[in-house]
Amino acid sequence: MDGPAHQTDTVMSDAAGQQPAPPSQPVAGIDNIPATLSHGGRFIQYNIFGNIFEVTAKYKPPIMPIGKGAYGIVCSALNSETNEHVAIKKIANAFDNKIDAKRTLREIKLLRHMDHENIVAIRDIIPPPQREAFNDVYIAYELMDTDLHQIIRSNQGLSEEHCQYFLYQILRGLKYIHSANVLHRDLKPSNLLLNANCDLKICDFGLARVTSETDFMTEYVVTRWYRAPELLLNSSDYTAAIDVWSVGCIFMELMDRKPLFPGRDHVHQLRLLMELIGTPSEAEMEFLNENAKRYIRQLPLYRRQSFVEKFPHVNPAAIDLVEKMLTFDPRRRITVEDALAHPYLTSLHDISDEPVCMTPFNFDFEQHALTEEQMKELIYREGLAFNPEYQHM
């Protein structure tokens, strides 16, 4: 879920010391968004920037636009039945592109399967007023205040305790995700949501994959700056270690307030990471195919830089953990469980409060070439699970 979420004046509290308030992002003078009852009062239509936003009548005014992405608009709204504020994402013409539709279905199924404090929860899939005219998908998520990307680019001070606490929560959520036999594959600061008391939740599972799957899916380009070397080199046999690499990049960006490897393109990305971690040895390249090995051998030889010298302001224990995350060979990269048990996180680590998912996620629905109509039906059923009263309407 992209885009900033609900604004708050609350000061973030309780990672340690003075906490940062989420950056304020005023929305241009929107106090009064026109609302019209529709479909016999069962739905309300809002007109937002010339776009129709049609939700069930329990989402009463006021409604506030809080983000916009390629997929459409995100609004905050109050569910009058539960008295909970939610972020509603509208995916317009959700079934026009089969890959996009499958991505939406995957995200819904994954988030409904997962139940963890550090993973954003789906609160509702809003059913369409008429089944036969089902084109737009509305997903309501629990509402968060901001995201890590907004915090990093703001001028607010972040204490080391903040960064440590954010890292711990990312790893805690990732432990659960990996235990469900799932890779996130697109971890980046904007996919890490925060609320006013520094709670962090991982979102955007549209690119997630089963951990045992070996074919490299190229339907979407994962954000380049956080991509593990094995993905940059088109290794088809990638593992949960790809997410650990992303976490290392994100943590250093938090500590340094700028991206660690801001590559302009594929080639530049690989060069940047080798300039820091050095050219891999033949032993470290064992997992790569011959083409990838040949490519690396013809590059200039890079000597590994000292992380301690390059980042003198970062706690040496944190540096030690990051070096283990940013290991070229995924087979030697630290696992999430071992990262949680690293001395840097001793003050936060509690294995009895780091749950795993008891049932692996089943990606079987991906194995079939679903038609547009079948995908509509599957998402419609997810909506009915939240709104059984619409079953016979």
Curated annotation (Swiss-Prot):
Reported modifications of this chain: Dually phosphorylated on Thr-218 and Tyr-220, which activates the enzyme. Very low autophosphorylation, although dramatically increased when Mn(2+) is added to the reaction instead of Mg(2+).
Enzyme class: transferase
CC annotations in GO: cytoplasm; nucleus
Motif TXY per UniProt: ranges: 218-220
Record-linked SMART domains: S_TKc (SM00220)
Region: Disordered, residue numbers: 1-32
Annotated signal peptide: none
Full protein name: Mitogen-activated protein kinase homolog NTF4
Species this chain originates from: Nicotiana tabacum
